[in-house]
Structure formats: structure tokens, C-alpha cells
């Protein structure tokens, strides 16, 4: 079975084609600058052959058609014809309360995704565009929606209801949803395999640390709490997002800086986090370099970032009544050696012992705790596309 996985953004389109027999990637690539000047497609096949196609890509329709054509290209392609694709799996950011698992796309499902799009206005409309274009260009080929929020729908009510007037939840669906669900699910399952124990017997804390960052408490394979909330703004300090703050700061800033609500929202989402505190960059590597050079604001930004991660690990250990493993994943989690060391070294109260030699690796699946560490620590590169492909294959086969 061959599955095409698509992640449609506002001006970009990422894709991977999987052969599910051995779960291998046949081809992958990205369409960049859709609807903008100097648009292009970057493509690589399983033979390691790469190509860049620079052409006018005015919309997603042209972008997806270009992907289909490139997958069938005589030199760089891996398919003889489009009919070899058995199904298409789409990343959809927000499923609200309507979707607790991945689902086969129908007209009714599209309508329901539209209904929750106000909860993810920067993502869902573009995800829907990808779905509609595929329906038009690939009629008859089944499509599956895989939601970032679905994995967290197992959270208990006490974890997802905010202490606001309850009618806001009833009328508007204001509650904690959580994100990065496919990533948290994948690395938790991998951790269980590396421990050679059933996932159902484990308490795992997964730390997805990238430009967007979240932590999840996973008890017996189910998400019981997560740091992101109604939107991806809550929780950890991120590249440009503030994470947890006192809500009263918002009207205070509006008054002091003479800003309207959209301007404050822009500050919290795009001008805060590592970037806002350091004044340098949203990229943790740049901030770390500046900190080493003696930049105090960069040092403060990193201290806050690490402190918030440790705070959530401690909280989620309490939520689950213990923890068997902590997993680091995503760009920072997989590659920031000193960041991991600093976080893990202060988890001694959990019986954690760091293996510094093992930790001295980037982007590699590895246990970084010692053999006698009571709580295991892993670095596991995430693979959200594979989760989408697996879910798509499972749903289409059933």
C-alpha cells in the first residue's frame, strides 16, 4: 500500500510518499512560497536523487499538481501513474471535540472541520484547501484526516475545563485541546518499545521541544494532560510564544502601550518567547551562542525556557503519581545537548541519572540515562508523517 502524506500550510506544502509494506519513504519534498514570487519545489527520492523546480505556483491547486507530476517524473519520480497511490493522509491541526481519532474524509467531515476552524484560523483553512484540491485532482482516492488534537481527547474533564463561566465551554468550546498529538503519540510508543514493556503499563512524559513546544503526560498510552491549551499559546516558553502568563497582563499591556487586542495577540504569539526575552532570535541555537558570549538577556531566556520544562515535568509526575520515562523530541529536544543536560541534571529527585556520553549526540534515537537510573530518559526523533501514514493505512484497510 502506498500512502501520500500532505501537510498544507498557508504558503507551503510538505509531502512524503510511503510504501507501507516496509514503512519506507519513497519520496519526500516541500513546495515553498505558494502564491508568492520565486516559488519552487524541492524533491528527493529514495535513491537519494534530488531536484529543485523553480516555477510559478499561484495556488495549492498548482502546488499539489506539481507534486503529483514530480512523483511520476521519468528521472526523479517513483510512480508509473497516480493510480498507484492508495490513499492520502492529511495533517489537520484542530479537530475540536468532534474528532477523538483520525477519520475517513467525507463531505460531512469537511463540514465539521470547517465548524472548528475558528479555533485554528491560521491552520485549518489551509489544511482544508489541501483536502479539497486532492478531491479534485485525485477523485476516487480515499483521504484521511489526522488531527493534532485527537490524541489528547482522552484527557479527563478536570484537566481540560478552564475555571471560567461554564457556559463559555458549552457555547464556544473553550477548553484545553492540546497539540503535537501525533508527535507525543509516536515517541511514547517508541519509548515503550525501547524499554521492552507494554505501553499500557507505563507512565511517560513526552517533551516536544521545537520552535513550538509542548509537554504531555501519558498514562497507560493515553494523554491525561498537556501543556498547550485552547490554542498553541499556552504552556512552555517557545520561539516567539510566551506560554503561561497572568491573563491580567493583557489589559495592562493594552493600556500602557495603547494597543488593541489583535496587536497584543500578535505580541504574545510572534514577539515573545525566546525572541522576546533575548531580543536576538527565536532560534535556540542563536540564543545559546549569545549566552556563551555573555549576553545576559539570552541567558535569562534560556533559564526561563529550561525552568518551565522542569516545572511541567514535576507537575506531570505528580498528576500521574510517578513517571517511568521522560522523552525529548523535536528540533531542540533532539539536538540541544546542553539544554537536555541542564534540564535532566535537576531531576535527581525522580531518581534520574544522566549518561553524559550518551547525551553527547544529536538527532539520534538513544537512551541518555544510566543503567541504574530509576526513571529512564530518551531522545527519540519524532516522525509525525509516519503516524499519519499508519493511521491512513489502518482506516482505509478497515
Swiss-Prot record:
Q: Principal localization?
A: cytoplasm
What are the GO cellular component annotations?
cytoplasm
Subcellular location per UniProt equals: Cytoplasm
| Residue numbers binding ATP | 14, 208-212, 283-285, 331-335
Q: Which positions are annotated as binding substrate?
A: 91
The record's keywords, sorted A to Z, are: ATP-binding, Cytoplasm, Kinase, Magnesium, Metal-binding, Nucleotide-binding, Transferase
What is this enzyme's catalytic activity, as reactions? acetate + ATP = acetyl phosphate + ADP
What positions are marked as the site Transition state stabilizer? Answer: 180, 241
How are cofactors bound according to the entry's free-text note?
Mg(2+). Can also accept Mn(2+).
Q: Which cofactor does it need?
A: Mg(2+); Mn(2+)
* List of catalytic residues: 148 (proton donor/acceptor)
The superkingdom listed in its UniProt entry is Bacteria
Q: Where is the signal peptide?
A: none
Residues where Mg(2+) binds: 7, 384
A GO term for molecular function: acetate kinase activity
What HAMAP family is this protein classified in?
Answer: Acetate_kinase
Give the quaternary structure: Homodimer.
Record family assignment: Belongs to the acetokinase family.
Q: Which PANTHER family match?
A: ACETATE KINASE, ACETATE KINASE-RELATED
Q: What is this protein called?
A: Acetate kinase
Q: Which organism is it from?
A: Halothermothrix orenii (strain H 168 / OCM 544 / DSM 9562)
Lineage of the native species? Bacteria, Bacillati, Bacillota, Clostridia, Halanaerobiales
Amino acid at each position: 500500500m502506498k500512502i501520500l502524506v500532505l501537510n498544507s500550510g498557508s504558503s507551503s506544502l510538505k509531502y512524503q510518499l510511503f510504501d507501507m509494506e516496509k514503512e519506507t519513504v519513497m519520496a519526500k519534498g516541500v513546495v515553498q512560497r505558494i502564491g508568492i514570487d520565486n516559488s519552487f519545489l524541492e524533491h528527493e527520492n529514495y535513491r537519494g536523487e534530488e531536484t529543485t523546480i523553480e516555477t510559478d505556483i499561484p495556488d495549492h491547486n498548482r502546488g499539489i499538481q506539481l507534486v503529483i507530476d514530480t512523483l511520476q517524473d521519468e528521472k526523479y519520480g517513483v510512480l508509473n501513474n497516480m493510480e498507484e497511490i492508495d490513499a492520502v493522509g492529511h495533517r489537520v491541526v484542530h479537530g475540536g471535540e468532534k474528532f477523538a481519532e483520525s477519520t475517513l474524509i467525507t463531505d460531512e467531515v469537511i463540514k465539521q472541520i470547517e465548524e472548528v476552524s475558528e479555533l485554528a484560523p491560521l491552520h485549518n483553512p489551509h489544511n482544508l484547501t489541501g483536502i479539497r484540491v486532492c478531491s479534485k485532482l485525485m477523485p476516487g482516492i480515499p483521504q484521511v484526516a489526522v488531527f493534532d488534537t485527537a490524541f489528547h481527547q482522552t484527557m479527563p474533564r478536570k484537566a481540560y475545563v478552564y475555571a471560567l463561566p461554564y457556559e463559555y465551554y458549552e457555547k464556544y468550546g473553550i477548553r484545553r485541546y492540546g497539540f503535537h498529538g501525533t508527535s507525543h503519540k509516536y515517541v511514547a510508543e517508541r519509548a515503550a518499545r525501547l524499554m521492552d514493556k507494554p505501553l499500557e503499563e507505563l507512565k511517560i512524559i513526552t517533551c516536544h521541544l521545537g520552535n513550538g513546544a509542548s509537554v504531555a503526560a501519558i498514562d497507560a498510552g493515553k494523554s491525561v494532560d498537556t501543556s498547550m491549551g485552547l490554542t498553541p499559546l499556552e504552556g512552555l516558553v517557545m520561539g516567539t510564544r510566551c506560554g503561561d502568563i497572568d491573563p491580567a497582563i493583557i489589559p495592562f499591556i493594552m493600556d500602557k502601550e495603547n494597543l488593541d487586542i489583535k496587536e497584543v495577540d500578535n505580541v504574545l504569539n510572534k514577539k515573545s518567547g525566546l525572541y522576546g526575552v533575548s531580543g536576538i532570535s527565536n532560534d535556540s541555537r542563536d540564543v545559546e551562542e549569545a549566552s556563551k558570549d555573555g549576553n545576559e538577556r539570552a541567558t535569562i531566556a534560556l533559564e526561563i525556557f529550561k525552568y518551565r520544562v522542569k516545572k511541567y515535568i514535576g507537575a506531570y509526575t505528580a498528576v500521574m503519581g510517578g513517571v517511568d520515562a521522560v522523552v525529548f523530541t523535536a528540533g531542540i529536544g533532539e539536538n540541544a545537548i546542553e539544554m537536555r543536560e541542564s534540564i535532566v541534571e535537576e531531576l535527581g529527585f525522580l531518581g534520574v541519572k544522566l549518561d553524559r556520553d550518551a547525551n553527547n549526540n544529536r538527532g539520534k534515537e538513544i537512551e541518555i540515562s544510566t543503567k541504574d537510573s530509576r526513571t529512564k530518559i530518551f531522545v527519540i526523533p519524532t516522525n509525525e508523517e509516519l503516524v499519519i501514514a499508519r493511521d491512513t493505512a489502518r482506516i482505509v484497510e478497515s
